[in-house]
């Protein structure tokens, strides 16, 4: 199970930061950890992430909370909560997640391990420690890699039939299978979230 979890974490990190494509040397799944920030969000773009939602963590003036680091930590409420729990000024200085490798991985591991109800943590979902509620079962949310997709980006990727979105999910799954093979472990038969309802829907 530990190897499967490592494969899952590496798969999402590689997908979120890759610079590889179908014609890349070694194949698309040989790439990852290239980009440290979400593309197209510099210079004040991607304001959609500048929300604290109902959390106490509101955006700092002049700062932007787009995806940064191996798992592309996004939204002011995630930067604020991660910073508070790790003792780092991430709400005031979100760029630390892309400029400091140690902080980048701390933030990624924080997100991976942190339950944010009603979502379980990625760790619990992939390790089988999460027990789906009646609502989760009704929404076809089950433990495994597909559930980690749902936790990370389910609102966009799960239950979508858009070809580009399906390709994104397939890319995550391709990385997962590659890393599982490299680590000498297997993956579950259904790694997708195609039938799962995302949270909030």
Predicted regions, residues:
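Short, well-ordered loop/turn and helix-capping segments at boundaries between secondary-structure elements
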Residues: 79, 114-118, 182-185
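Sequence contexts marking disulfide-bonded cysteines in secreted/extracellular proteins
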Residues: 40-47, 123-128, 157-159, 190-194
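Extracellular low-complexity, O-glycosylation-prone Ser/Thr/Pro/Gly-rich "stalks"
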Residues: 131-201
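Short alpha-helical "patches" and their helix-cap loops
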Residues: 25-36, 90, 120-135, 164-174
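Peptidoglycan-targeting cell-wall enzymes and recognition modules
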Residues: 5-114, 141-144, 148-151, 156-158
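Surface-exposed patches in mature extracellular/periplasmic domains of secreted proteins
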Residues: 1-6, 22-26, 119-129, 187-193
